[in-house]
């Protein structure tokens, strides 16, 4: 079984989503997990323990295993990610330029079939819609919005 498939099966079996997986040349395996309610340190510990066991049983060589949440600026990789985060602000970098640019920032629209929409500002106050597919994307990330103001009024 391939490493990605092995880790995804383990992570989803525990009730989490595998967001991303990175393997460095120095033997480090980084696993990014998520779930609708968010990820806690306990979730990371639970997945780490299970993956350590599975990787040992499957005789997968690694130096260090790191499990964490994808962060507020999580990557968007699957069509389901774009469905889940429709209405959120994101930055999309295309593989090939469209109308002279590759990077767009705007509000995600739910996919229609394989086509994903991003509403962006073309010029001051002029809204436009970018339609693209997963195959067109080089990188896509959410843009986090953090409010540091006190909730006290």
UniProtKB/Swiss-Prot annotation:
Is Cytoplasm set as a keyword in this record? yes
Q: Pfam families under this entry?
A: DUF150_C, RimP_N
What's the domain of life for this entry? Bacteria
Tell where it localizes.
Cytoplasm
Q: Which UniProt keywords apply?
A: Cytoplasm, Ribosome biogenesis
Biological processes per GO annotation: ribosomal small subunit assembly; translation
Gene3D superfamilies (UniProt xref): Ribosome maturation factor RimP, C-terminal domain, RimP-like superfamily, N-terminal
Q: What is its main location?
A: cytoplasm
* SUPFAM superfamilies listed in its UniProt record: YhbC-like, C-terminal domain, YhbC-like, N-terminal domain
InterPro entries on file: Ribosome_maturation_RimP, RimP_C, RimP_C_sf, RimP_N, RimP_N_sf
A GO cellular component entry from the record:
cytosol
**Transmembrane stretches, by residue range?**
none
Indicate yes or no for the key word Hydrolase: no
Described by its record, this protein's role is as follows: Required for maturation of 30S ribosomal subunits.
Please report which protein family the annotation says this sequence is part of: Belongs to the RimP family.
Q: What is this protein called?
A: Ribosome maturation factor RimP
What lineage does the source organism belong to? Bacteria, Pseudomonadati, Pseudomonadota, Betaproteobacteria, Burkholderiales
